[in-house]
Amino acid sequence: MKCLILAAGYATRLYPLTENFPKPLLKVGEKTILDWLVDDIDTLNVVDEFVVISNHKFAHHFEGWAATKVQKITVVDDGTDTNETRLGAVKDIQFAIEKLQLTDDMLVIAGDNVLDFSLTKFMQYALEKGISCIMRYFEPEAKKLSKSGVITLGDGDEVLEMAEKPAVPASNWCCPPFYYYTAEDAQLVRKGIESGCGTDAPGSYIAWLCRQTAVHAMEMPGKRYDIGNLESYEKVKAEYNGITK
């Protein structure tokens, strides 16, 4: 299995902190955001390579970080230099798949979230299901729902529909940017793009994929900290106690 880490954004809402430094390498406690994610995922011993998808501006920072790690980490530079010219998450996924000629199952995650639970729980869930899977959590606030990916559930965790940033949310189930694609479904990303799925938000591909094949959603067993602005970063630094579940 490969783990694709989406890290090509420019984090403009965190300026000046991230004007010349990538958000995924900011420290939370004693480790960087990426360290928390990679070190946790690695404990299950099913990922044989981590692929960090970066923009050109920050690629050298990720290369320097990768050189300090014991895991096999490949940094892919998507060639963009500005927020205005960014490819978007789905196109970045496709760029990495084609550049590295990846044919494996994939864990695809955002590089700017920390969790208080181990992602290995989600990986085990997906491997047992044997199909593409996502995670979900209950969000009571309509304002937050309208800024997220929202799913409609059927029986047995099946995802019937997903919408990114819906004006009228169909449910209270939010989908965070942590996905498992089977090898077969990972090869359909280009088809999804060509069929008109959105390319900026990473969940746009899942919104298309769940209409083509079965996708299941595991309820998150803990809390996710999304670092979107300076205020949320300071809050995470004050509250986060590591992976406790």
Predicted segments, located by residue:
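Residue-level signal for inorganic ion chemistry
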Residues: 34, 96, 112, 151, ...
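Active-site metal-binding loops of divalent metal-dependent hydrolases
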Residues: 10, 112-113
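Short acidic-glycine loop/turn motifs at beta-strand connectors
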Residues: 152-158
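Alpha-helical elements of Rossmann-like donor-binding domains used by nucleotide-donor carbohydrate transfer enzymes
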Residues: 61, 91-95, 121, 204-205, ...
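Catalytic-core segments of class I nucleotidyltransferases/pyrophosphorylases
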Residues: 123-127, 158-226, 230-245
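Conserved N-terminal catalytic core of the sugar/cofactor nucleotidyltransferase
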Residues: 2-5, 13, 27, 31-108
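Conserved donor-nucleotide/metal-binding helix-loop-beta segment in metal-dependent transferases, i.e.
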Residues: 117-146
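A short, conserved beta-strand element in the Rossmann-like catalytic core
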Residues: 113-116, 224
